[in-house]
Amino acid sequence: MKNQLKHFLLFAVLVVLGTVTAVAQATLKGKVMDAETHEPLIGATVMVKGSAEGTVTDTDGNFTLKVKDGKVMLVFSYVGYNELSRNVKAVGRNVDLGTIALNS
């Protein structure tokens, strides 16, 4: 009986630790602007390459995106502008990418 209890407790601890690891996330934030005019690009798309994760910028060109911890490639795009890809190491709670400038 004691042996079964030990196995059950070990299993429960592993499940809890696995769940905590699975939900480890970083929040990426930044601003997408026109490279020449420095105007914010409203509704620019920010996507994680190879996934359905993404967001669009707000009226000030700002975005926030939650991703799993690790390396990701972000793709920034806007109609009439050249697409820009950027590798990001997403580790920790908040990662500020600063200003992303797109060329038309």
Model regions: which residues?
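Periplasm-facing N-terminal accessory domains of Gram-negative outer-membrane beta-barrel systems
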Residues: 22-104
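Cleavable N-terminal targeting peptides that direct proteins into the secretory/outer-membrane pathway or into
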Residues: 1-26
